[in-house]
Amino acid sequence: MQRIPLWLVRSTHCLILLFQDDVQVRKSCLEPFLFLSPERKREIHQLLVAFNQSLVTPTQDEEKILSDIQRACLQIAEDLKHLNPFTGLLLDLNLYTLWTLLRNYKTKQRSQPVNSTVVSRYAHHVVKYIMQRLVYTTDRLFLTAPTSGIVLPVPLANAIFNLLSHCRKKCTGLWRNYGTEKSVLMGLGKEITLCYQALNESGIVSTTLAAFIKLSFPTISIPNLFKPMFQSCKGNQDNFPDICTQGSVIRRPHQGVFGDTFPIPDPLMREISENSFKKFSTANISTLLQNPKEILEMDPFDPRIGGFPLNKEETATPLKDSSFSNPTFINTGAANTLLPAASVTPALESLFSPTHFPCMSDESIASTSHVPLDNNISLPTLVKTNFPLKRKRQSRNIDPNTPRRPRGRPKGSKTKKRPTCSPALFQSSDIPTDSLHVKCPEMLPTVPQNEFCDSSNIQPCTSSSVLENDNLVPINEAETDDNILATILQDLYDLPAPPVLCSHENQTLEIDNNVDIEDLGLSFPMSLQDFLNDE
């Protein structure tokens, strides 16, 4: 029996994958979605199947697929509208799961026109944007809570911190990690909502805390998110400049280049088109929380708190919806409402700073100040204008035979040697300059061995009297640690040579009253009482 070559088997398998109609979308991939109805999950499954079919047959209307995805995102936002105050957080998590599925199923296709569609090109950028948006909102929550006088319960703070740690870990690793561990991330989001519900039922959560969480997690602007994609369908060129690497050649992301580094978050750069992130004029937002009950009753998609109208007919005259005031999952009725009721509706917009241009120079602001920010300006164009690529360095004509310039300090340079410690530092401050060349002190104190060491037993002796006394026995310098230490200090600090140490055996010398402390070369008092009197 003749064996089939292995290369032929692999080639046949690749051809089967290349010409197959679509990749089977498993229904188990819809399990990570949070608080969505079964009907909504079935619509998402049909959308994924249609998206895979569009990757194989790109002749299909590309704008129709994009409109279906936008409609699905708006329907997800409508289903999460009643989950007050975590509507913004849960919307980000569910949109992250949806766009991660679009990105992952795009990578599974082996057909040639996979990356030619708009959704496949933008999928990874949307996933990255939502992930860094989660990092931005959670960081802002932990920073503004203590400055605003908000005390987060310990279980809720730990749950939010676990979500922040997971998101930051995904941002600092390889770009492939964005499409992994969807279930882990959605489980952390579900843990936050369940923890908040348990604390709210116990009466621990106040209305101020609930309003603060609602302001900390604004809803994402879905129309502005899809605006560059629709412009790309109409023929506009996509520009995705790399902000992290400002070199002439864009490096490929790998662990050695982008490991343990965090790039500039996209929410800081895309604020011009993404209006859900309104800059607070101060870190203390306690003024916004004067009437927290009114903030909780506001629509989470209200433009005053960074939202957007879900329906197009509500753009001109937004109507107040009463469905959000009675949430079905998270109830804030048991919250403490003993707070001053001051109306903050007229001053709500004034507490936010005006339009902010992050990371822009004065020249860029001056050049773009007269240009109206209309809806025709695409997001990549704004990013490319505000963050131009680094100018390439001009090549220099250097002769390869020319020796290279040596690095470091050249020989014979006039650099001063670091001064060493001189004996003048041990002299008194009132000694004249002419006396600083003294080689050794005139008097040294000695203490008898059979008496206590106090100020009355200190016996000074001169160098001349020590040599004239016949009863003095010299000590071997090689056998004492003091002489060894004195020699080391002399070498290190360029000190004068110490005098010969001698011991007194059964000799009682009278105290010389003529000895002055300045003769010893010391500037500090000799006894504790003198030290106290000096102080």
Curated annotation (Swiss-Prot):
Residues 384-426 are annotated as: Disordered. One of its GO terms (molecular function) is DNA binding. The keyword RNA-binding does not apply. One of its GO terms (biological process) is regulation of DNA-templated transcription. Keywords: Activator, DNA-binding, Early protein, Transcription, Transcription regulation. Residues 404-419 have a biased composition (Basic residues). Pfam families: Herpes_TAF50. Belongs to the herpesviridae TAF50 family. Transcription activation. Regulates the delayed-early 110 kDa promoter. This is Putative transcription activator BRLF1 homolog. It comes from Saimiriine herpesvirus 2 (strain 11) (SaHV-2).
